[in-house]
């Protein structure tokens, strides 16, 4: 069970259980790439950080300027240099990463290798949709 932390004020935190938790855990056992999409500020990042906190995932956010610049400059190199299972947050900022993820996951389709989050569904991007179907 995972809870979402909501800070009500400086001293009070409320926890909200999310039903998506079990679905995420099941998907991580089946698929090499798991996408968590949704509108801004709905708890995607918090969900992922809580669910995967003790599972050995390395977390990368494309809100970090240096991470963003590296990913934009060399999407394939960025993905190939990641170690272990990874979370890439805000994937919509560098959609070219999706093709690199496809390539790497085709080479090694280990379940749960990539968890990506974003506020734009990459499957709606014409250049990406066909490449990632079924992953």
Where are these regions (language model features)?
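Phosphate-binding site recognition
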Residues: 1-135
């Amino acid at each position: 069970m995972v809870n979402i932390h909501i800070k009500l004020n400086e001293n009070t935190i409320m926890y909200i259980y999310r039903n998506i938790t079990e679905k995420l855990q099941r998907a991580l056992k089946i698929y090499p790439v798991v996408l968590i999409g949704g509108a801004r500020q709905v708890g995607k990042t918090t969900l992922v950080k809580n669910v995967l906190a003790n599972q050995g995932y390395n977390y990368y956010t494309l809100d970090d300027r240096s991470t963003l610049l590296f990913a934009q400059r060399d999407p394939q190199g960025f993905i190939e240099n990641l170690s272990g299972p990874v979370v890439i947050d805000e994937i919509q900022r560098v959609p070219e990463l999706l093709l690199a993820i496809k390539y790497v996951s085709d080479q090694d389709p280990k379940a749960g290798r990539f968890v990506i989050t974003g506020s734009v569904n990459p499957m709606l991007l014409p250049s990406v949709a066909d490449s990632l179907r079924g992953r």
